[in-house]
Curated annotation (Swiss-Prot):
The lineage of its organism: Archaea, Methanobacteriati, Methanobacteriota, Thermococci, Thermococcales. One of its GO terms (molecular function) is 4-hydroxy-tetrahydrodipicolinate synthase activity. The active site is at T43 (charge relay system), Y104 (charge relay system), Y130 (proton donor), K158 (schiff-base intermediate with substrate). This is Uncharacterized DapA-like lyase PYRAB12600. It comes from Pyrococcus abyssi (strain GE5 / Orsay). Keywords: Cytoplasm, Lyase, Schiff base. Belongs to the DapA family.
Amino acid sequence: MEGVIVPLVTPFREDYSIDFEALEWHIRFLEEKGVHGIFVNSTTGEFTSLNTDERKMLAEKGREITSGMYLVGTGSTSTLEVIELSRHAEDIGADGIVIVAPYYCKLKDEEILKHFSMVAERVDIPIIVYAIPSCANPVPVDIIRKVSLEYSNIIGVKASVDSLTYLQELIEVKEERKDFRVFTGLDQYFLSTLLLGGDGGIMACANFAPEIHLQIWNSFKRRNFEEAIKLSRVLGEISRIYNVASSFASAVKLAMIAKGFPIKPVLRPPHVIDGEEVFNEIKGILRSLENVKP
Protein backbone atom coordinates (compact mmCIF):
# COMPACT_ATOMS: atom_id res chain seq x y z
CA MET A 1 0.00 0.00 0.00
CA GLU A 2 1.57 3.24 -1.16
CA GLY A 3 1.19 6.27 -3.36
CA VAL A 4 -1.79 8.57 -3.92
CA ILE A 5 -4.98 7.55 -2.12
CA VAL A 6 -8.08 9.72 -2.45
CA PRO A 7 -10.40 10.42 0.53
CA LEU A 8 -13.60 10.77 -1.48
CA VAL A 9 -16.18 13.45 -1.05
CA THR A 10 -19.69 12.05 -0.64
CA PRO A 11 -21.89 13.60 -3.34
CA PHE A 12 -25.45 14.48 -2.31
CA ARG A 13 -28.62 15.39 -4.16
CA GLU A 14 -30.70 18.45 -3.23
CA ASP A 15 -32.76 16.29 -0.84
CA TYR A 16 -29.51 15.28 0.97
CA SER A 17 -29.67 11.67 -0.21
CA ILE A 18 -26.42 10.15 -1.47
CA ASP A 19 -25.92 10.67 -5.20
CA PHE A 20 -24.60 7.26 -6.21
CA GLU A 21 -24.45 8.16 -9.91
CA ALA A 22 -22.06 11.02 -9.14
CA LEU A 23 -20.10 8.71 -6.81
CA GLU A 24 -19.62 6.18 -9.60
CA TRP A 25 -18.56 8.88 -12.08
CA HIS A 26 -16.03 10.21 -9.61
CA ILE A 27 -14.47 6.84 -8.77
CA ARG A 28 -14.23 5.93 -12.46
CA PHE A 29 -12.59 9.30 -13.18
CA LEU A 30 -10.00 8.83 -10.43
CA GLU A 31 -9.15 5.26 -11.40
CA GLU A 32 -8.74 6.29 -15.04
CA LYS A 33 -6.27 8.94 -13.86
CA GLY A 34 -4.28 6.20 -12.12
CA VAL A 35 -4.66 6.88 -8.39
CA HIS A 36 -3.44 4.09 -6.14
CA GLY A 37 -6.47 3.82 -3.88
CA ILE A 38 -9.98 5.00 -3.03
CA PHE A 39 -11.13 5.80 0.53
CA VAL A 40 -14.82 6.27 1.41
CA ASN A 41 -16.40 7.50 4.66
CA SER A 42 -13.56 9.96 5.15
CA THR A 43 -13.51 13.34 6.89
CA THR A 44 -13.80 15.01 3.49
CA GLY A 45 -16.65 12.59 2.81
CA GLU A 46 -18.66 14.03 5.72
CA PHE A 47 -18.86 10.68 7.50
CA THR A 48 -20.01 12.33 10.73
CA SER A 49 -23.20 13.43 8.93
CA LEU A 50 -24.08 9.90 7.79
CA ASN A 51 -25.95 7.35 9.87
CA THR A 52 -24.67 3.81 10.34
CA ASP A 53 -26.84 2.30 7.59
CA GLU A 54 -25.76 4.99 5.13
CA ARG A 55 -22.11 4.42 5.96
CA LYS A 56 -22.51 0.71 5.29
CA MET A 57 -24.43 1.36 2.07
CA LEU A 58 -21.77 3.81 0.86
CA ALA A 59 -19.03 1.31 1.69
CA GLU A 60 -20.83 -1.44 -0.22
CA LYS A 61 -21.48 0.70 -3.29
CA GLY A 62 -17.92 1.99 -3.33
CA ARG A 63 -16.60 -1.57 -3.16
CA GLU A 64 -18.78 -2.55 -6.13
CA ILE A 65 -17.44 0.32 -8.24
CA THR A 66 -13.77 0.35 -7.24
CA SER A 67 -11.51 -2.05 -9.10
CA GLY A 68 -8.32 -1.17 -7.23
CA MET A 69 -7.24 -0.75 -3.63
CA TYR A 70 -10.17 0.22 -1.43
CA LEU A 71 -10.31 1.65 2.09
CA VAL A 72 -13.29 2.35 4.33
CA GLY A 73 -13.39 4.81 7.22
CA THR A 74 -14.92 3.21 10.31
CA GLY A 75 -14.25 5.86 12.96
CA SER A 76 -16.82 6.78 15.59
CA THR A 77 -17.12 8.10 19.13
CA SER A 78 -18.21 4.57 20.11
CA THR A 79 -15.63 1.77 20.11
CA LEU A 80 -18.40 -0.81 19.70
CA GLU A 81 -19.74 0.97 16.61
CA VAL A 82 -16.21 1.07 15.18
CA ILE A 83 -16.02 -2.69 15.62
CA GLU A 84 -19.40 -3.14 13.92
CA LEU A 85 -18.43 -0.95 10.96
CA SER A 86 -14.99 -2.56 10.72
CA ARG A 87 -16.47 -6.06 10.59
CA HIS A 88 -18.83 -4.88 7.88
CA ALA A 89 -15.93 -3.45 5.86
CA GLU A 90 -14.12 -6.76 6.26
CA ASP A 91 -17.20 -8.70 5.14
CA ILE A 92 -17.64 -6.67 1.92
CA GLY A 93 -14.02 -7.18 0.90
CA ALA A 94 -12.40 -3.84 1.69
CA ASP A 95 -8.61 -3.89 1.55
CA GLY A 96 -8.28 -1.91 4.76
CA ILE A 97 -10.00 0.40 7.22
CA VAL A 98 -9.08 3.85 8.49
CA ILE A 99 -9.89 4.55 12.14
CA VAL A 100 -9.75 8.04 13.59
CA ALA A 101 -9.34 8.45 17.32
CA PRO A 102 -12.66 9.10 19.11
CA TYR A 103 -13.79 12.72 19.00
CA TYR A 104 -16.06 15.06 21.03
CA CYS A 105 -15.04 13.76 24.49
CA LYS A 106 -11.48 14.32 25.67
CA LEU A 107 -9.79 10.98 26.32
CA LYS A 108 -6.78 9.88 28.34
CA ASP A 109 -3.94 8.14 26.54
CA GLU A 110 -4.90 4.80 28.10
CA GLU A 111 -8.42 5.18 26.69
CA ILE A 112 -7.13 5.92 23.20
CA LEU A 113 -4.87 2.88 23.49
CA LYS A 114 -7.80 0.72 24.60
CA HIS A 115 -9.91 1.95 21.68
CA PHE A 116 -7.44 0.90 19.00
CA SER A 117 -6.50 -2.30 20.83
CA MET A 118 -10.11 -3.48 21.14
CA VAL A 119 -10.73 -2.99 17.43
CA ALA A 120 -7.48 -4.68 16.39
CA GLU A 121 -8.29 -7.70 18.55
CA ARG A 122 -11.72 -8.16 16.96
CA VAL A 123 -11.01 -7.88 13.23
CA ASP A 124 -8.37 -9.24 10.88
CA ILE A 125 -8.62 -6.53 8.21
CA PRO A 126 -5.60 -4.19 7.89
CA ILE A 127 -6.01 -1.03 9.98
CA ILE A 128 -4.66 2.47 9.37
CA VAL A 129 -4.71 4.69 12.45
CA TYR A 130 -5.84 8.22 11.62
CA ALA A 131 -4.32 11.12 13.57
CA ILE A 132 -6.15 14.42 13.02
CA PRO A 133 -5.90 16.52 16.19
CA SER A 134 -7.89 19.38 14.66
CA CYS A 135 -10.99 17.15 14.70
CA ALA A 136 -10.35 14.34 17.19
CA ASN A 137 -8.32 13.36 20.23
CA PRO A 138 -4.59 13.62 19.47
CA VAL A 139 -2.81 10.28 19.08
CA PRO A 140 0.72 10.32 20.56
CA VAL A 141 3.44 8.61 18.53
CA ASP A 142 4.11 6.29 21.49
CA ILE A 143 0.58 4.88 21.22
CA ILE A 144 0.91 4.36 17.48
CA ARG A 145 4.27 2.66 18.00
CA LYS A 146 2.87 0.42 20.73
CA VAL A 147 -0.19 -0.79 18.83
CA SER A 148 1.70 -1.26 15.57
CA LEU A 149 4.26 -3.48 17.30
CA GLU A 150 1.62 -5.44 19.23
CA TYR A 151 -0.96 -5.95 16.48
CA SER A 152 0.10 -7.15 13.04
CA ASN A 153 -3.13 -5.90 11.46
CA ILE A 154 -2.36 -2.30 12.43
CA ILE A 155 -0.31 -1.62 9.34
CA GLY A 156 0.07 2.14 9.18
CA VAL A 157 -0.96 5.67 10.01
CA LYS A 158 -2.50 8.63 8.24
CA ALA A 159 -1.25 11.85 9.83
CA SER A 160 -3.13 15.10 9.25
CA VAL A 161 -0.83 16.87 11.66
CA ASP A 162 0.94 20.14 10.86
CA SER A 163 4.27 19.03 12.33
CA LEU A 164 7.31 17.65 10.54
CA THR A 165 8.64 16.48 13.90
CA TYR A 166 5.55 14.34 14.47
CA LEU A 167 5.80 13.01 10.92
CA GLN A 168 9.48 12.14 11.32
CA GLU A 169 8.81 10.32 14.60
CA LEU A 170 6.11 8.25 12.89
CA ILE A 171 8.48 7.35 10.08
CA GLU A 172 11.01 6.20 12.68
CA VAL A 173 8.52 3.49 13.69
CA LYS A 174 9.44 1.86 10.37
CA GLU A 175 12.87 1.11 11.84
CA GLU A 176 11.16 -1.24 14.31
CA ARG A 177 8.53 -2.54 11.90
CA LYS A 178 9.68 -2.56 8.30
CA ASP A 179 6.24 -2.96 6.72
CA PHE A 180 4.65 -0.08 8.67
CA ARG A 181 3.16 2.53 6.32
CA VAL A 182 3.13 6.28 6.91
CA PHE A 183 0.79 8.52 4.91
CA THR A 184 0.28 12.24 5.20
CA GLY A 185 -3.22 13.65 5.12
CA LEU A 186 -1.96 17.12 4.17
CA ASP A 187 -1.49 17.87 0.47
CA GLN A 188 1.26 20.38 1.18
CA TYR A 189 3.24 17.72 3.11
CA PHE A 190 3.16 15.12 0.35
CA LEU A 191 6.66 15.56 -1.03
CA SER A 192 8.14 16.12 2.45
CA THR A 193 6.60 12.84 3.56
CA LEU A 194 8.18 10.98 0.66
CA LEU A 195 11.58 12.60 1.20
CA LEU A 196 11.54 11.69 4.89
CA GLY A 197 10.85 8.05 4.07
CA GLY A 198 7.05 7.90 4.14
CA ASP A 199 4.88 5.91 1.78
CA GLY A 200 2.42 8.36 0.26
CA GLY A 201 -0.56 10.54 0.99
CA ILE A 202 -4.31 10.32 1.55
CA MET A 203 -5.09 13.86 0.43
CA ALA A 204 -8.34 15.68 -0.28
CA CYS A 205 -7.15 17.86 -3.19
CA ALA A 206 -6.62 14.64 -5.14
CA ASN A 207 -10.41 14.58 -5.54
CA PHE A 208 -10.11 17.25 -8.23
CA ALA A 209 -6.38 17.47 -9.07
CA PRO A 210 -5.04 13.90 -8.96
CA GLU A 211 -2.72 14.66 -11.87
CA ILE A 212 -0.58 16.90 -9.65
CA HIS A 213 -0.25 14.32 -6.89
CA LEU A 214 0.56 11.57 -9.37
CA GLN A 215 3.15 13.70 -11.15
CA ILE A 216 4.83 14.42 -7.81
CA TRP A 217 4.79 10.71 -7.00
CA ASN A 218 6.20 9.72 -10.39
CA SER A 219 8.84 12.47 -10.34
CA PHE A 220 9.94 11.35 -6.88
CA LYS A 221 10.15 7.72 -8.00
CA ARG A 222 12.28 8.78 -10.98
CA ARG A 223 14.42 10.84 -8.61
CA ASN A 224 13.59 13.96 -10.60
CA PHE A 225 13.55 16.08 -7.47
CA GLU A 226 13.66 19.41 -9.30
CA GLU A 227 10.39 18.58 -11.05
CA ALA A 228 8.87 17.19 -7.84
CA ILE A 229 9.69 20.40 -5.96
CA LYS A 230 8.19 22.56 -8.71
CA LEU A 231 4.97 20.54 -8.67
CA SER A 232 4.90 20.54 -4.88
CA ARG A 233 4.83 24.33 -4.93
CA VAL A 234 1.77 24.18 -7.19
CA LEU A 235 0.12 21.73 -4.81
CA GLY A 236 0.89 24.03 -1.91
CA GLU A 237 -0.81 26.88 -3.76
CA ILE A 238 -3.88 24.74 -4.48
CA SER A 239 -4.05 23.77 -0.80
CA ARG A 240 -4.94 27.37 0.01
CA ILE A 241 -8.55 26.46 -0.80
CA TYR A 242 -8.76 25.10 2.75
CA ASN A 243 -7.93 28.53 4.14
CA VAL A 244 -10.76 30.33 2.36
CA ALA A 245 -13.54 27.77 2.85
CA SER A 246 -15.42 26.88 6.03
CA SER A 247 -14.73 23.13 5.82
CA PHE A 248 -12.70 20.52 3.93
CA ALA A 249 -15.82 19.25 2.19
CA SER A 250 -16.95 22.72 1.13
CA ALA A 251 -13.50 23.58 -0.23
CA VAL A 252 -13.16 20.37 -2.21
CA LYS A 253 -16.70 20.27 -3.57
CA LEU A 254 -16.47 23.88 -4.75
CA ALA A 255 -13.13 23.12 -6.41
CA MET A 256 -14.69 20.12 -8.14
CA ILE A 257 -17.60 22.25 -9.35
CA ALA A 258 -15.17 24.93 -10.57
CA LYS A 259 -13.49 22.24 -12.67
CA GLY A 260 -16.79 21.05 -14.12
CA PHE A 261 -17.28 17.85 -12.15
CA PRO A 262 -20.89 16.55 -12.13
CA ILE A 263 -21.63 17.04 -8.44
CA LYS A 264 -24.06 19.36 -6.72
CA PRO A 265 -23.10 22.15 -4.26
CA VAL A 266 -24.67 20.32 -1.33
CA LEU A 267 -23.31 19.46 2.12
CA ARG A 268 -25.20 17.46 4.72
CA PRO A 269 -26.72 19.59 7.51
CA PRO A 270 -25.69 21.14 9.75
CA HIS A 271 -22.89 22.02 7.32
CA VAL A 272 -23.57 24.62 4.64
CA ILE A 273 -21.54 25.01 1.47
CA ASP A 274 -19.81 28.37 1.05
CA GLY A 275 -21.26 31.00 -1.26
CA GLU A 276 -20.25 32.90 -4.37
CA GLU A 277 -17.46 34.93 -2.77
CA VAL A 278 -15.59 31.84 -1.59
CA PHE A 279 -16.34 30.04 -4.86
CA ASN A 280 -14.71 32.87 -6.80
CA GLU A 281 -11.67 32.82 -4.50
CA ILE A 282 -11.30 29.09 -5.08
CA LYS A 283 -11.56 29.56 -8.85
CA GLY A 284 -8.76 32.11 -8.59
CA ILE A 285 -6.57 29.71 -6.62
CA LEU A 286 -7.15 26.94 -9.16
CA ARG A 287 -5.71 29.09 -11.94
CA SER A 288 -2.31 27.88 -10.73
CA LEU A 289 -3.23 24.55 -12.37
CA GLU A 290 -3.51 26.06 -15.83
CA ASN A 291 0.22 25.94 -16.56
CA VAL A 292 0.70 22.37 -15.33
CA LYS A 293 0.92 19.79 -18.10
CA PRO A 294 -1.42 16.80 -17.55
